[in-house]
A protein has these predicted regions:
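Hinge/capping helix and adjacent helix->loop/strand transition within the periplasmic-binding protein
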Residues: 1-56, 106, 116-151
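Generic structural signal for alpha-helix termini and adjacent loop/cap motifs
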Residues: 16, 20, 68, 76, ...
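Ligand-binding pocket segment of bilobal, Venus flytrap-like solute-binding proteins
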Residues: 22-103
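An extracytoplasmic/periplasmic, membrane-proximal ligand-sensing/linker region
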Residues: 45-48, 90, 129-190
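Periplasmic-binding protein-like
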Residues: 91-125
Length: 190
């Protein structure tokens, strides 16, 4: 949020959204971005109506928020501006982050909300299982290194690892969840 915003919690945002349906704007890095999907899920659960303002990347959205062209931003690109004091954090889409321990997850306010942005490593079809397991072991070791954890935390990120099968299961669950959000919100990709 812009520091000038009257909202100081996600609950404040929801109250404003309920009092003024279709008035509050939120920026994201684009249509179909994880941040867009997260806010569509919020609207679905809370029965609120917000106006999505998609940008061509997070940096443009951050600039728009600082310039008070939008009411709020849902994008990791804002982390540097939060740390620099130019923006105030209200909530994160996943669980609390070590880098922002006083910033609650949306799920702490919106019952049933569960959404995290994530990255994963994939290998070409047909890659031997032994190679996949070895890569997974190497990634786990790298993710456990204190300097890697510290660097990720400095970017507002946290490393979480899994087994290859857990990741396959996660992909399936996420694909189904995003599909439901897209269908319910009638999102069209151009």
């Amino acid at each position: 949020m812009n520091p000038k915003s009257p909202s100081n919690s996600f609950e404040d945002i929801l109250k404003r959204a309920q009092a003024q349906p279709g008035k509050l704007t939120y920026g994201t890095s684009g249509i179909g971005s994880p941040s867009h999907m997260a806010m569509e899920l919020v609207q679905s659960i809370t029965k609120t109506e917000l106006v999505h303002v998609p940008f061509k990347g997070g940096a443009q959205a951050v600039t728009a928020l600082i310039g008070e062209q939008i009411d709020m931003l849902v994008d990791g690109a804002a982390f540097g501006q939060i740390k620099g004091g130019r923006l105030k954090p209200i909530a994160v889409t996943g669980p609390r982050l070590p880098a922002l321990p006083d910033t609650p997850g949306i799920g702490e306010t919106v019952r049933g909300f569960e959404f995290t942005n994530w990255w994963g490593f994939l290998a070409p079809v047909g890659t031997p299982v032994e190679a996949i397991n070895r890569l997974n072991d190497e990634f786990k070791q790298i993710a456990a290194l204190p300097d890697i954890r510290e660097r990720l935390s400095g970017l507002g990120l946290a490393a979480r690892t899994s087994t290859p099968q857990q990741f396959v299961d996660h992909l399936q669950i996420e694909t189904e969840k995003i599909g439901r959000i897209v269908k319910a919100a009638n999102i069209k990709f151009e």
